[in-house]
Amino acid sequence: MVENMLANGVNADFVRTVEGVPTGIAIVTVGENDNTIIVVAGANAEVDRAYVDSVKEELLTYDMVVLQHEIPLDTVHYIVDLCFENQIPVVLNPAPAAEVPADIIEKVTWLTPNEHEAVLIFGEGKTTEELLLAYPEKLLITQGSRGVSTALRSGQVLNVPVRPAKVADTSGAGDTLNGAFCYRIAMGDSVEEALRYANTAASLSTEKFGAQGGMPTAAEVEKALKEAAG
């Protein structure tokens, strides 16, 4: 895993080996172009407050921090609080699905659940549009084949449809979308520009098998965007 990260230009300086604990794994079963994922946390469960404190000096130099629920929720919330106190933007992808406290929702810059995760977090009392309008340019909801939606501060609900794709495997599509969205936001794109880029990247990822192996390069995404624009 680390070798693959390094081969793709990802800094792995702070990836640590935990003695006697296996690497976390996700077993993905694919059928009818969809997937079921079984997660064994392994060493991911060892990412605690002490580890965060040990890398705090480095963490506070970052332009953006991206989190998921793949590590203990206590650690996630600890990092959110730390970043909020130091005015560092945080993107929280609440997967695997779990409740998100109201104060954490307020402190993150972006919250990016899928439809099912959004129901768990906010309940079933409001429509997707009502939820988005309650959290403009904070809440981003992915909706599978129906694309991704958010609300702008102007009050407009922005729906970005999916790019047509020959779907082979949806594993990692959400991770791809989140990564691409954060990349483009960090590069200065508008919300709409970043979402169109991210949705295209996610669509391309579904045309290959594997969560990591299916992720497209920036060049592939740019090519697809140019082709779509004619």
Question: Language-model features: where?
Answer:
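Conserved N-terminal subdomain of the carbohydrate kinase-like
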Residues: M1-D63, V221-G230
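Conserved phosphate-binding/catalytic region of the ribokinase-like
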Residues: E99-D103, K126-G230
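A residue-level structural signature of the nucleotidyltransferase/glycosyltransferase Rossmann-like core
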Residues: N44, W110, K138-L140
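Short, hinge-like loop/turn segments at secondary-structure boundaries
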Residues: N4-N8, G31-D34, E85, K107-L111, ...
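Structural motif corresponding to alpha-helix initiation and N-cap regions
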Residues: G24, R49-V55, L73, A97-E99, ...
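Conserved beta-alpha-beta core of the PfkB/ribokinase-like small-molecule kinase fold
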Residues: M64-E130, R146-G147
